[in-house]
């Protein structure tokens, strides 16, 4: 991993580089647990949040993944290299924060479902003030949002993904939700 030392709340915090994100989504999604999402606000203040819950969405074959319907203007960022943000609106009211993984033209993404003290993907983006303006932002070189490795280990649990009945039983039952307590 290309890591750059960053001052933080944790004994050693390291900014995560591109090679972390260009791996398969089923490797990256659990590896994101206990990583630190860092957000720099317009006033210069910086907040750090530990990731506690993720879900993997694995390309055009995954019926729950937005890319299952092919390449569109909405999903274009999913076809870019890992480390970019894919942000979209659901139900006309909640922004969803996803991190693109894999290589170019491998549309995979990890939904950030929870942070320490914030459970649920809509609550996460609302609490952090995240919206479409960060769609396509690159976590490896952005000065507004990035990830750090806290060096902390977690007991990671799995379960089927949430809220994807439309994808059918096969895809709904995949244990691609990762979380810790």
Task: Put a short name on every predicted segment.
Residues 2-181:
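Conserved, well-structured core segments that form or line functional sites
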């Amino acid at each position: 991993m290309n890591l750059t030392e960053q001052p933080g709340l944790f004994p050693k915090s390291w900014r995560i580089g591109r090679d972390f994100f260009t791996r398969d989504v089923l490797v990256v999604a659990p590896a994101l647990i206990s990583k630190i999402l860092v957000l720099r606000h317009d006033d210069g203040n910086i907040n750090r949040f530990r990731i506690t819950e993720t879900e993997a969405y694995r390309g055009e074959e995954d019926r729950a993944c937005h890319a299952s319907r092919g390449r569109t203007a909405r999903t274009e960022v999913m076809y870019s290299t890992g480390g970019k943000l894919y942000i979209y609106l659901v139900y006309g009211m909640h922004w969803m924060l996803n991190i693109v993984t894999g290589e170019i033209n491998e549309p995979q993404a990890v939904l950030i479902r929870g942070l320490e003290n914030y459970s649920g993907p809509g609550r996460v983006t609302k609490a952090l003030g995240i919206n479409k303006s960060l769609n396509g932002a690159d976590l490896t070189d952005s000065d507004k949002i990035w990830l750090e490795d806290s060096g902390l280990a977690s007991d990671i649990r799995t379960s089927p993904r949430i809220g994807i009945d439309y994808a059918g039983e096969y895809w709904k039952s995949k244990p691609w939700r990762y979380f810790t307590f």
